[in-house]
Structure formats: structure tokens, C-alpha cells
Amino acid sequence: MKQILDFIPLIIFFALYKMYDIYTATGALIIATAIQLVVTYALYKKVEKMQLITFIMVTVFGGMTIFLHDDNFIKWKVTIVYCVFAAGLIIAHILGKPVIKGMLGKEVTLPDDKWTKINHAWVLFFTVCAIANLYVAFEMPLDVWVNFKVFGLLGLTFLYTLFTGMYVYKHMPKEKKEEQE
């Protein structure tokens, strides 16, 4: 349910972009993301930092897109969010507070070096996505960027999450694997 809530604003953005324009879609994205936060809090009594960061970025860059009537701001938002996530993982690692281990460590037991590899892999993933977004956003037509943002980046994230899960499963202690099966 929680994952579905995360995708609703993106689906609304895509639908309204196709029906109207980038500015209508951006306004709807801001509203849908705000509603998503409220619903998430009402259901789970908690909002994750990633959701909050995304909401702030959507509101700031989406607001600038609408107010200045310039779609470059919403395009930059995607790259900046990925850079913030990558930087957050790097800083947390330096401070000795591995974020991914904190998210999954209660359900999954792995050696610290494996958590570090996963952390570094996600830093690389977010960095590559940020660069790819810059290229597509500013070298391709707006329609291509919207499709890339909605389907390309979403698909890449899904696949990378799947590969991370396979890596985690491969390195889980044998008794934990048997519990999972």
C-alpha cells in the first residue's frame, strides 16, 4: 500500500501532462504530493525523510516552474533530488550511520561490508540517474523527458531495487534464507 501511495503523484503528473501541459501537471504534482504526505501520516503515523525531501523539492521547484512559467525548474528538481539522496547516503556513511542498513537491517542480517557495498551502489545509481536526467531533460524534447522521468527512471529504480534484493539474498546467512523461504 505504501509503495502505491508513492507512485500516485507521478501517475497524476503524467496523465495531466498528456491531457493538458507541464504547468497543469506540475501544479497537480504539488497537490498530489501534499495529499500523499497527509495520507501516509494518517495511515502510518510517520513520514519518511525521503518523502519529506521529495515534497519540499516538488513544492519549491514546482512552484518556481509555475510562477516563472519555466519548465526547466521541474526538470532540475529530479536531478537535485537524486543528488541530495546520493549526498545523504555519503554523509550518513561518513558519520557511521548507514541509511540502507537502518531501513532494512531489522529484517535482513548482513555483514557491514555488504551494507557498505549496497550503500555505495545506491550512491552510484542516484548519481547516474541525476546525470541521465540532466542529459534527457536538456537535450531532448519535453515529451521525451516526461516519458523518461515517469517510465525510464521508475523502471530503472525498480530494476535496481530488484538487483539489490538479489544481492542481499545472495549474502544472507543460510538460516535467514531458510526462514525467508
Swiss-Prot record:
Its main location: membrane. It comes from the Bacteria. InterPro entries: YciB. The chain crosses the membrane at residues 22-42, 50-70, 80-100, 122-142, 148-168. It is found in: Cell inner membrane. It is a multi-pass membrane protein. Pfam families: IspA. Keywords: Cell inner membrane, Cell membrane, Membrane, Transmembrane, Transmembrane helix. Plays a role in cell envelope biogenesis, maintenance of cell envelope integrity and membrane homeostasis. Belongs to the YciB family. This is Inner membrane-spanning protein YciB.
